[in-house]
Amino acid sequence: MKMNLKPAYRYQFKNFLKGSAVFYIIMAFIITAFMVLSVNIGENSSINFGGYGLSVAIYMFVVGIVYIRSDLRLCLQFGISRRTAFLSELLSLLSISVILSIAGELVTASAQAVASGKPNVFVFDFYQLIYLGTDRVSPTFGQHIMSAFTNTSLFCSVCIVGMFFSLLFWRLNKFWTIVVAISIPFALNGIPYLLVKLGVNLNPLVKWIASSPFCFILTCFVIAALVAIIDWCLLRNANIKAAK
């Protein structure tokens, strides 16, 4: 099979872009409605909005689950190798993450400009909430750039993790699919409890990640790289079959 990276990337990018455009329009409408609502708010009341980054992260996680299977099947039908399909998928999700991050900064900055004259109206995003605080109404241009990098790393990592769950369930039979699906909530609650019982203190790691956006970005890309390797291991020998 040929290394047809360009056509595979073009198709997958367009596929990502269509859904992302609809999602962004919805988010822009929500933020616009929020700003319209804030116009008539009294001085004794306060209102805040800071959900763009986390909303996109959830969206990208779902995208990672949904798109990888159909994209792989279509690429193989057109004679494109699994390696090329996987690489083009990674490039597509990186491109969309960058676009959604920049677009998010634009709409957030616009909303912050409108709310600048109202001290009781707060518009902020993930980066500002962690590293600047909500009391700073208008981040600088450099801080918006850093926020875009932070969001890009977050969006990429959660999308690749979503791909992992999709590929994992793709490889499992029905019995193990049910077992793993039931085990996930128990693992999410049980592993932290087990770590505490074993005396493993994660607070230094959490503080290190929260100490600087560079630490956060590095952590996200390390997670993305490690999970991407696991994704490829699941994908390279998978039997191509319909989604469950």
Q: Which stretches of residues belong to each language-model region?
A:
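Hydrophobic alpha-helical transmembrane segments
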Residues: 1-45, 191-244
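Helix-loop-helix units of permease transmembrane domains in multi-pass membrane transporters
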Residues: 9, 68-94
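Alpha-helical transmembrane segments of polytopic membrane proteins
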Residues: 20-23, 53-58, 147-155, 183, ...
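Secretory targeting signals
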Residues: 33-56, 92-172
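Long, hydrophobic alpha-helical segments
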Residues: 49-70
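Transmembrane alpha-helical segments in integral membrane proteins
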Residues: 67-69, 150-176, 223-238
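Hydrophobic residues within alpha-helical transmembrane segments
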Residues: 90-91, 95, 218, 222
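Central hydrophobic cores of alpha-helical transmembrane segments
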Residues: 174-188
